[in-house]
């Protein structure tokens, strides 16, 4: 019997796939558990239209992520932090600090999408990666300045 998986099932496939399984397995386990539905002509057509709609949504998200990446690349970010006389910071500049600076510029990004190669503990210029979409990653440059010092 052919079924359409509603959820990811180990050793069978991912949600949305059409797979062939034995009748007993489908009728006694997959369908009652809500893991699959019978693959009829109507459900297959509905699956195809749903896949097309999701592809359109993903393309729109990808396009907006690319536009946002272009905006972020143009930004000159400055992070203010408390520092000693030698230029060493009291603490570190984290992804949350960069997310806060981006938010002040009008771009709201979750701090978990920002990665830095190493902790920033001194004044200077640095780069971080921002993952906006599965295949859209932008490098953002930022400068760490001592708090209260105007450039």
UniProtKB/Swiss-Prot annotation:
Q: Which UniProt keywords apply?
A: Ribonucleoprotein, Ribosomal protein, RNA-binding, rRNA-binding
GO molecular function (one): rRNA binding
Picking any one GO biological process from the record gives: translation
A Pfam family hit: Ribosomal_L9_N
**Superkingdom per UniProt:** Bacteria
Annotated Gene Ontology cellular component terms: ribonucleoprotein complex; ribosome
Q: What does this protein do?
A: Binds to the 23S rRNA.
Q: Which family does it belong to?
A: Belongs to the bacterial ribosomal protein bL9 family.
Q: What is this protein called?
A: Large ribosomal subunit protein bL9
Q: Which organism is it from?
A: Chlorobium phaeovibrioides (strain DSM 265 / 1930) (Prosthecochloris vibrioformis (strain DSM 265))
Q: Which gene encodes it?
A: rplI
